From Swiss-Prot:
Species of the source: Arabidopsis thaliana
WD repeat spans: 482-521, 531-571, 574-614, 616-656, 660-698, 707-746, 762-794
Full protein name: Protein SPA1-RELATED 4
A GO molecular-function descriptor: protein kinase activity
Keywords, alphabetical: Coiled coil, Nucleotide-binding, Nucleus, Phytochrome signaling pathway, Repeat, Transferase, Ubl conjugation pathway, WD repeat
Signal peptide boundaries: none
Pfam family, one: WD40
Sequence motif: DWD box, positions: 635-649
Amino acid sequence: MKGSSESSSRGLNNTSGVSEFCTDGSKSLSHIDYVRSLLGSHKEANLGGLDDDSIVRALECEDVSLRQWLDNPDRSVDAFECFHVFRQIVEIVNAAHSQGIVVHNVRPSCFVMSSFNNVSFIESASCSDSGSDEDATTKSREIGSSRQEEILSERRSKQQEEVKKQPFPMKQILAMEMSWYTSHEEDNGSLCNCASDIYRLGVLLFELFCPVSSREEKSRTMSSLRHRVLPPQILLNWPKEASFCLWLLHPEPSCRPSMSELLQSEFINEPRENLEEREAAMELRDRIEEQELLLEFLFLIQQRKQEAADKLQDTISLLSSDIDQVVKRQLVLQQKGRDVRSFLASRKRIRQGAETTAAEEENDDNSIDEESKLDDTLESTLLESSRLMRNLKKLESVYFATRYRQIKAATAAEKPLARYYSALSCNGRSSEKSSMSQPSKDPINDSRQGGWIDPFLEGLCKYLSFSKLRVKADLKQGDLLNSSNLVCAIGFDRDGEFFATAGVNKKIKIFECESIIKDGRDIHYPVVELASRSKLSGICWNSYIKSQVASSNFEGVVQVWDVARNQLVTEMKEHEKRVWSIDYSSADPTLLASGSDDGSVKLWSINQGVSIGTIKTKANICCVQFPSETGRSLAFGSADHKVYYYDLRNPKLPLCTMIGHHKTVSYVRFVDSSTLVSSSTDNTLKLWDLSMSISGINETPLHSFMGHTNVKNFVGLSVSDGYIATGSETNEVFVYHKAFPMPVLSYKFKTIDPVSELEVDDASQFISSVCWRGQSSTLVAANSTGNIKILEMV
């Protein structure tokens, strides 16, 4: 409705002769000439500071027609708002009259209102004598601007199209508006004059203060207005306005006020003063609101900075407390060192019979050795300092995470104690007894008394203990007649004496580790070689029976071998698809677990040769592992990006589900009884604390290890004494420590071109398997070409 009334008020043609303006000199001006002279008079009178572009801006903006605004059924009368609108139109008419021009078109359809209630007079087709394209073109040329001409032409053509679409009642209202705003003398055939404009101002004033809800009522009210009959509500609610309106609507032109009398009247000036006061108050209120907004902004910034300052102060306090604890420990250790030295010195003084010459020679030799050791120590210290500074930010984040986690745990432990002592107090127990039984130290303070130092210091020392991975031996064991020598799995026996490899060449090869290290040759032959019918995916040694090895293959078969006898012991074929992983229980060496692409985990008894339990899931199982301390629980990783931890006594539901990876979980390994690490093809390893699960869900890993590349292949995972080894698709081996998320060491396999014998970068090669030699610093790694290296952290 709004759109239709607006377009109609701007687009309806009429024939009432409203495009010419009669003056006392009987001169006539086109409507555009009038507008331009009106704008000029506004400039002179400082009534708006308008220019020719103001019309263009008025036409470009979708302002609300004054007719549309008046006919809005939801409009309520705001006296100041109505006076503000009326005064603006009076000033426009006065500007025209001061130049001897009769406006004639003082009608709501010829004015538009902005969102700020600023009124503008527009040249509308509804205010034009002719709707022809020729007249429109002539008028648009008079603007004198090609931009204005183009906008006006497009506007008129659009309005003419919209007029055709307008419903008949809207056209009727605009036609009726013409009759409402026609003065008595014009009805009698007289020419319009300035008094006629005064009459039209009276009609407009009446419309401003008399809103009507329906068109029928509007028509009746305006017909009565022709006879100066006003509705009772306007006489009751707005008596002063009604009286002034009747003066402007006097049937005799000579009895109407002139424009100067109108401007000097108390009716115009008093509301203007009130309006100015109101505008000043509104401006003051706006400025106050702006200041409040600025103040709120500053308070918000201050609050955030204060929170940051408080947090920084807490951090500094925590650091100061920790520094004090470390200094105290250092003083205690130094005192112990002095005691040991004094004890050794007293024993040395007993040896009085030693020869002086021999002692001097020995001292010379010792001094040389000490200088050498000092150089090595200095070099090691500089290296450690360099690595410390290079990873300072990450070490810092781990330190604070460790401390806050410990404080949080201490706070949680304090709450039940506080409730307990509160209950004792409520039960009437003596405060003396309570104070005697209550611990003297706050758990939070206890957590700050050095409980964090040993674990963090141990991790830091282990992180800085080694500087590189050194190659101890190279092993080329690939078959010349086999096109693929990818090693899928490596495993050491219980004593770390032998290691086995298994891969797509369908063979299990057993090597003696020490003989390979001592022998400088590149090519080594296995001490035992076992042949399988299918490609092998996994291998595992029995921790109790030294010669027993289990393997899994691509056909879904689990096999148990006797290495000493070089024969197959048993074969289990219950899986329907490829088996990716197998693992023996260290606590129960007769128990074996396997995970398959068929979505199941099977538990096997090697004595019975059949499965004794099955855990069925909805996704492929890529890895399984028992914790070393018990055979009653099992962890496995799945293609659904999750890690599951089961109590095998209740295999229906997982004890804990670890959620955090974004792609397939390819490996899981236990670091200790309550911590495990998982590897995924999302380029990360994640360390999980099994005790941190809430309602069986753990979504917060202790660390996410990043540095290696792993997006599509299985690259291996092995754990030893807190060190975590994994492969990378960059043909590198990475070693992490459980305490920190960044790599400790890395080593890249070199690829030598057999023709040029030069080192080349082969992007297709990747590390396919890694395995620690027990709890030592020795690591065996193999890549996708079958190249095996024995590495050592030094």
